[in-house]
UniProtKB/Swiss-Prot annotation:
Localisation: Endoplasmic reticulum membrane; Golgi apparatus membrane
GO terms of biological process kind: cell differentiation; negative regulation of transcription by RNA polymerase II; positive regulation of transcription by RNA polymerase II
Record-annotated disulphide pairs: none
Protein name (Swiss-Prot/TrEMBL): Motile sperm domain-containing protein 1
Effect ascribed to mutating residue 63 to I: In a breast cancer sample; somatic mutation
One GO CC term, this protein: perinuclear region of cytoplasm
Membrane topology: Multi-pass membrane protein
Amino acid sequence: MHQQKRQPELVEGNLPVFVFPTELIFYADDQSTHKQVLTLYNPYEFALKFKVLCTTPNKYVVVDAAGAVKPQCCVDIVIRHRDVRSCHYGVIDKFRLQVSEQSQRKALGRKEVVATLLPSAKEQQKEEEEKRLKEHLTESLFFEQSFQPENRAVSSGPSLLTVFLGVVCIAALMLPTLGDVESLVPLYLHLSVNQKLVAAYILGLITMAILRT
């Protein structure tokens, strides 16, 4: 005898609801944006009923505000803005999608979608560009204030390593050359001609580096 597989009991209000997009933006000067589509996804193994509610239902027309979604399917919900006036610019309205099992009345989950009417897409893009520019300038100013003093300190003169190498090269050139008999300097400090040429070459490079800074 096969045991019937029982579906786990779902807690009211805890079921995740998948809707795209989560924000609707209508532009007054672009009539093509006055109609937008919400897509409700059902990734579950059971059918869902849905219902669309709105905080300002007089401003919108919701096509198929209630219906059902088959398991692992999706449904498109068309929303039209029917009150495009300047007094509504910038006002944030909210849609709430509630879902439940077909055999139940209690709402298993809900999702809110915000809707905003703006005067123009171009103005919106301009505002976003200005915002990005201000953020970029702020970041640049912060970078300059944070790092410029350090850079100036570094570039104000030669490094200690450069000075040390220069002193070593000068000292090497002042040491006696191999073969000099009349010298008070110990023999192991006598340098060959090739060694002195290398020291002179390095000293020249160091001098050029110091002059460039």
